[in-house]
């Protein structure tokens, strides 16, 4: 899994050299942001149930057909609603994993790689998850550097889905 730290080390090691000043600055920058990133991951994890529930309701409000159409890919039943919440939770977990490692590696490796195929196979609309992530971003209750760190990866997920 790629992170800014592993990429800097891999680049230096592949060339048989020590880290350059630029690479050390990248590493230092990550350490400077690490506390805020970990605080964001903790807060999102602690509030996950509330955020996921609110995000699902935001999807149902913006796309009411998702609760009216029958079928396994819609939220017209309790099982469908549980699947929607599970999927939103997956995106939120990926955001927290990115916060912990300080890079998009987890999202790139576990989400982005097969995202288009999954959405096509199960007839899932990326716009549902974009709406859910926007809700999470606007309602996570974080501020300052902690919010900036969280929003970086939420925005990355939104852009990936767009």
UniProtKB/Swiss-Prot annotation:
One cellular component term from this protein's GO annotations in UniProt: phycobilisome
Pfam families: Phycobilisome
Cited CDD domains: PC-PEC_alpha
Topological relation to the membrane, as annotated: Peripheral membrane protein
Binding-site positions, (2R,3E)-phycocyanobilin: 83-87, 115-124
More about this protein: The light-harvesting antenna system in red algae and cyanobacteria is formed of phycobilisomes. These are composed of the phycobiliproteins phycoerythrin (CPE), phycocyanin (CPC) and allophycocyanin (APC). Cyanobacteria also contain phycoerythrocyanin (PCC). The phycobiliproteins all share the same subunit composition and organization with variations in the covalently bound open-chain tetrapyrrole chromophores.
Family: Belongs to the phycobiliprotein family.
Record's protein name: R-phycocyanin alpha chain
Gene that this polypeptide is encoded by: rpcA
